[in-house]
């Protein structure tokens, strides 16, 4: 079984021990690469942003487990040099995949801004995700945490990543393997990042549905796109 997940530290509890498990090949890569590999069928499952999961034909979502931000995100932000409502050009995180969609949906839904994509030298703002958040950029002095913006708007948790399985993958075995990895990881990992939850309960699912409604209005979902759970 071939499983892919981003290299970000907050993902560690969900893949705890998988690299050492017989019959499992674990690929840690950038979100954009994981999406491509799942679309090509070279992975059986990958941890993806919800909008990316919908870009995989007939993918199924493993319920109950994911990356959830109940409040602030800290690892996902918009850096800007103008007020958010005035952003006309934005530089995306080229490796961030569907995490860029979250920022662009918030700009459109909360601030009425639908900026075009630009290189960083001409941009009014840039989207930073994962490890890139650690870098300061004096050209964009204002930092806006995506989790905080989302929570202020909706009062709901944000589901940042879900386990997406390709069509034809061994679903029962995959659910067992991923569930056991999460149980081990949450029991044995002591340095879990504070803003992150790994359980997709009722409130998180409400947040996920709200986000996909917004993303659909903004044109970020494929036609007829809907998450299908396994």
Model-derived segments and spans:
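Domain-level signature for soluble enzymes in the chorismate/prephenate branch of the shikimate pathway
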Residues: 1-230
């Amino acid at each position: 079984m071939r499983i892919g997940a981003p290299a970000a530290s907050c993902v560690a509890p969900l893949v705890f021990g998988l690299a050492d498990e017989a019959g499992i090949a674990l690929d840690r890569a950038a979100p954009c690469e994981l999406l491509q590999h799942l679309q090509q069928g070279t992975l059986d499952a990958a941890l993806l942003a919800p909008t990316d999961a919908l870009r995989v034909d007939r993918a199924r979502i493993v319920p109950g487990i994911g990356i959830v931000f109940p409040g602030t995100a800290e690892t996902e932000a918009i850096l800007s040099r103008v007020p958010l409502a005035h952003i006309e050009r934005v530089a995306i995180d080229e490796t961030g995949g569907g995490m860029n969609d979250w920022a662009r949906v918030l700009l459109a839904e909360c601030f009425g801004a639908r900026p075009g994509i630009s290189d960083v030298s001409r941009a009014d703002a840039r989207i930073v995700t994962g490890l890139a958040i650690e870098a300061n950029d004096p050209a964009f002095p204002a930092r806006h945490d995506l989790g905080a913006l989302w929570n202020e708007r909706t009062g709901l948790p944000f589901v940042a990543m879900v386990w997406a399985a390709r069509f034809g993958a061994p679903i029962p075995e995959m659910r067992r393997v991923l569930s056991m990895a999460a149980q081990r990881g949450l029991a044995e990992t002591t340095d879990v990042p504070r803003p992150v939850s790994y359980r997709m309960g009722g409130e998180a699912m409400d947040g996920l549905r709200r986000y996909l409604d917004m993303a659909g209005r903004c044109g970020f979902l494929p036609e007829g796109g809907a998450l299908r759970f396994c």
